[in-house]
Amino acid sequence: MDLVEKIKILQNHLKVRNFKKVIEGSKVLLNKMPNNDYLLNITGMAYQGLSQHDNSIKCFNRALKHSPNNLAAMNNLANSLKAIGKLEESKDLYENILKINPNYINAYNNYANLKTLVNDYDGAIQLYKKAYSIIEKMDNVPNSTVTGILFSLAAAYQSANKIEETQEIVKKILSIDPSHVGAHKLTGSLIKYSNDNEESMKHIKEMEEVDKQINDQDLLKKVDISYALGKSYEDLKNYEKAFHYLSKANQLKFDKKGSNLEAEKKAIRNIIKIFEGIDLKNSNIEPQEKKIIFILGMPRSGTTLTEQIVASHSEVYGAGELIYLQQVLKKNFVNDSKYEKQRIIDFQNLSKNIIF
């Protein structure tokens, strides 16, 4: 079997998410061709698929060492850096890609995803719009690519509370793909279903038709359309049907992922144990002038509404679900995916701390 055939096999494994097969096969070929940037890139993508981002970063850096203008490797490196919280480095790479090739759609899309991650929705919107404007001028672009970018744009508009723009984009998506589950679910989140509103009742019928068309094996779509239908019937106060669809969605998720209550209990006990004997008030850390309000609660328990009410005060800014606390905790107190109690104690005893 020649090299081209072997690489095609690896590409096929990558497409169907057989990431370990890709890594195993690439290692054999890289022993013979250690500087092949294409092989290094797909190996990095396989590690990326397994969330082994440190390994993926090594592969992408090796690819770029031998081929500095390999934009695919550069884009993938930016994605892995983004995944581990190195947002500035990721941002610089996306911008560098777009300087080299201003029409590189993946970079626009991924850079926009980064903007969304840090709640810069206006910045994300501009990047998604630019990606879409490029695609509009291209021939033979798969509908899934077009609707994918449009859906990201619609979600960014919604996050920026630009409802009319969101609805306009969703209509465009459904004109291309009437069965687009994400667009139907997003539509459902924007409207209040009512027996007196013909459009909303029509939308329920459309979603029920989409539900019939989806194979039960297509788990994510089935779950999303079931949640959307559950919400619509909840609005109509038809709780029997609402429960049917919500229960169906939950059962599908459970069947796929399962649940380990004992593991959850153990994780909670470990968190409590870590902080036993640590007096958080007895610290050398200088108090901050800025006061931070955390709003915690179970899903669908009213935390979003509570945040909106509190944020309506002139001296309060509602920041939404931020990633920064998670990044700081990960960087300073976690080793090998576990919190280290001694690190927390050491940090508490410092007089001044710069941890970002």
Task: Please report, for each region that a protein language model flagged, where it lies by residue.
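Phosphate-binding active sites in nucleotide-utilizing proteins
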Residues: 286-356
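Conserved alpha-helical positions within TPR/SEL1-like repeat arrays
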Residues: 11, 38-49, 72-83, 106-117, ...
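TPR-repeat structural position
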Residues: 19, 53, 87, 121, ...
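Structural marker of alpha-solenoid helical repeat scaffolds
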Residues: 32, 66, 100, 134-141, ...
